[in-house]
């Protein structure tokens, strides 16, 4: 996946010849980046990456040159409820902001990937806008969505 998309700054944790100087991954205030204990995140991919590469990956998913239409539909068909206003499917999550709070009813929905350490790559199809962030801490998974809502509220006020 990395080579065809020219994601030169992405690799699998612990399977890289020369580990780069990566940001810390914090769990209860302890930095786990140099410990061989991050196998807990293999369901999230165990990938070290940059926000630029996350954007490259999300754009590749959206432009239709990376997956078949059928697989893309399966990935974006988020039927299972994760939490209020948050749904998931085959590798993707969908955020219905009007369901999260009636005060967010005018905010367009987004979908994409979200990790346990507060990292996300999300796409607003209606506005053709990508939202990418990485908070690097297990304690920021929920906080990252709160911050996304704040960012979206500012972004939605900007006239382009």
Predicted segments — roles?
Residues 1-110:
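Short, surface-exposed loop or secondary-structure junction motifs
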Residues 18-19, 115-117:
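Short acidic/glycine-enriched loop/turn segments that link adjacent beta-strands
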Residues 19, 128-131, 141, 145:
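Alpha-helix termini
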Residues 51-52, 97, 118-124, 142:
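Residues at secondary-structure transition points
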Residues 78, 97-100, 140-160:
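Short, gly/Ser/Thr-rich active-site loops of penicillin-recognizing serine hydrolases
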Residues 110, 117-130:
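Short, surface-exposed beta-strand/loop micro-motifs that present aromatic residues
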